[in-house]
């Protein structure tokens, strides 16, 4: 924003963000900062967000599953109680920062006694070098070496999830 303020000669500017435009994206912070600068009279700008392919939608399509009945969360640069989400939900879509997040998740699931989960992971979805991995918790050690370093979108399925109480009483 400070660059735009210092260079008013630039009247059409683009900012590119990787990932989903509305799912834990820096695009939202940028939009908010531009709106605040407009309100203060520092800038005069219009913001248009042009989405790409949603990683959750892409992974669900590749796997042939719906995602309207899933919980969406992220541990890519943030803290989330994934164990609790997986314990209480059959499907959890999750953004991960890399291989270390897989190791941490598997260890947390084991510590919590959640052993019967299937994890499907998409890497570089929609790109020519896209990869899909599916494994159960007990197969993790053998699959870890196949995982390239990078950001992942995962579907964690737990058929043994606890029944959720949807209404009081």
Question: What would you call each of these model-derived segments?
Answer:
Residues 19-90:
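Class I SAM-dependent methyltransferase SAM-binding "motif I" and its flanking Rossmann-like core
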Residues 1-2, 53-55, 71-78, 97-98, ...:
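Short, acidic/turn-prone active-site loops that include or flank metal/cofactor-
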Residues 12-13, 88-169:
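A contiguous loop/helix-start segment that scaffolds small-molecule binding in enzyme catalytic cores
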Residues 2-5, 13-18, 22-33, 95, ...:
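Phosphate-bearing ligand-interacting subdomains
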Residues 7-11, 43:
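Glycine-rich phosphate-binding loop signature in dinucleotide/nucleotide-binding domains
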Residues 2-8, 81-87, 142-145:
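Short amphipathic alpha-helix with an adjacent loop that forms part of the alpha/beta core around
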Residues 6, 36-40, 151-154:
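Polar low-complexity intrinsically disordered regions
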